[in-house]
Amino acid sequence: GPMPAAVLYTHSKFVQENPNTTQALANAMVHALRWLTKAGPSDIVKTVPESYLLGDRALYLAAWENVRQAISPDGLMPEAGPATALRMLKTFEPSLADKSIDLAKTYTNAFARRADVKYS
């Protein structure tokens, strides 16, 4: 299933006490994701440190083109994403093996939805 990768995470207390900061972080993430989905190869290369290219700009750009489709254009957590992440975590974190976790309580798309509207 879909595997969440670049995410913002914190304690719910921080979100409750700092909604404006939380929204600003979500705005930045969604804005960056939208840019990444539209950026051309030359735009990408201009922003990436030379050391990331590992001496092969063409290979880096080819790899980028292959991974681009996996980038979320709106920053929303896919419905099946948390379950996929939990299954993966349980494979190497023994303390989670027998835990029942209400995944709906572990994330919110509210901030990403507002950011998506802002940058639509």
Model-derived regions, located:
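Periplasmic-binding protein-like
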Residues: G1-N18, A26, N66-V67, A104-A115
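Secondary-structure end/capping motifs
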Residues: Q16-A97
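Conserved C-terminal helix/tail region of periplasmic/extracytoplasmic solute-binding proteins
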Residues: L86-S120
